[in-house]
Amino acid sequence: MSVTVKRIIDSTVIVPKLPANEDPVEYPADYFRKSKEIPLYINTTKSLSDLRGYVYQGLKSGNVSIIHVNSYLYGALKDIRGKLDKDWSSFGINIGKAGDTIGIFDLVSVKALDGVLPDGVSDASRTSADDKWLPLYLLGLYRVGRTQMPEYRKKLMDGLTNQCKMINEQFEPLVPEGRDIFDVWGNDSNYTKIVAAVDMFFHMFKKHECASFRYGTIVSRFKDCAALATFGHLCKITGMSTEDVTTWILNREVADEMVQMMLPGQEIDKADSYMPYLIDFGLSSKSPYSSVKNPAFHFWGQLTALLLRSTRARNARQPDDIEYTSLTTAGLLYAYAVGSSADLAQQFCVGDNKYTPDDSTGGLTTNAPPQGRDVVEWLGWFEDQNRKPTPDMMQYAKRAVMSLQGLREKTIGKYAKSEFDK
């Protein structure tokens, strides 16, 4: 129901609205309600031998076709199999039964790609031995191409080279340093579906002899799910359950985004689901779990984690156009509550030698903060402080950030440093 606003001078009634300039989020379960398959379009008109040469020479010349890459990957990987030790299903799709032997492309529905296959340069010197490392290299370039930071990019490329050399000692990189022809491969939906299928398969068969192919594909898992990762990180850094962490959400925007992320039926907590690959499988064009669609939650969670001395949180992206003041206060209060209390209790005993706390002793002075992590107690105390951070809270935050150095712009670490280390 729309809320109307009345102009005082002449009683004109208006209904304030903002332009709908953002696409709505798309959930993976909705995709499978409309379709029971994930189509993968592959050209299968050329032999694996031809495709191997096309890809090898194309990489060396800097003129490789993504259609050749996809067709080669399909040809080289389609016979890789794994035997299930349990039933495997996701979103009502029966992938396989316990005891079944399945392949990577049983996760998708392979269809013929229409059109003429681009020309390629053959290379008769390439053999089936290349199929042990060339797929790893092609899939690894996906991970390298996702980052634009030169130092990290070089680190990933060096790691990929080492992975390939473990299979073939004579391996030499086919793409010269500085060439970025593979950066755009991530825009090809068939390539990303292969990446997702490979990672999902080897996530199930972690001990498979070809599981090292995940070096490049692992970033496909939970792609565009940064806010969901923030939630998991916050649970770990606080040592609190998902339920207890949720009770510490004190801002309407954060609560709205939490409701958005926790929509039932999405298989978030099912490890062998299609859900972690919702972007690369094309199940969603707008992830409900990204930091872009959950900026307030992401900021609040990462700021709290940073104030609890998380090294990972320092480089988390700082969102734009959010209500920083309230979110900062909420994060500070939560971090202060966790950082000021130790969740200690005897876990084992010998015989009956157990410590029993005496709840009848002690008590709080007027301004003393609570000793536990109960959000109700902390909110009551915060009300007594006129809902403003106390000097001790500000000192706590300053101690948490004062040693941070080399911070990048537009990061949570940079924001917290400027906010608390004054």
Swiss-Prot record:
Residues that bind RNA: R143, Y152, K206, R214, K286, R317, R408
Record-level GO cellular component terms: helical viral capsid; host cell cytoplasm; ribonucleoprotein complex; viral nucleocapsid
Keywords: Capsid protein, Helical capsid protein, Host cytoplasm, Ribonucleoprotein, RNA-binding, Viral nucleoprotein, Virion
Locations listed in the record: Virion; Host cytoplasm
SUPFAM superfamilies: Rhabdovirus nucleoprotein-like
A GO MF label: RNA binding
Family from the record: Belongs to the vesiculovirus nucleocapsid protein family.
Protein purpose: Encapsidates the genome in a ratio of one N per nine ribonucleotides, protecting it from nucleases. The encapsidated genomic RNA is termed the NC and serves as template for transcription and replication. The nucleocapsid is bullet-shaped with the tip containing 8 turns of a conical spiral before reaching the helical cylindrical trunk. Nucleocapsid assembly is concomitant with replication, therefore viral replication depends on the intracellular concentration of free N, termed N(0). All replicative products are resistant to nucleases.
Assembly and interaction partners: Homomultimerizes to form the nucleocapsid. Binds to viral genomic RNA; this interaction contributes to the virion assembly. N in the nucleocapsid interacts (via C-terminus) with the P protein (via C-terminus); this interaction allows to package the L polymerase in the virion and positions the polymerase on the template, since P acts as a bridge between N and L. N(0) interacts with the P protein; this interaction prevents the uncontrolled aggregation of N(0). Interacts with the matrix protein (inner layer); this interaction contributes to the virion assembly. Interacts with the L polymerase.
Protein name: Nucleoprotein
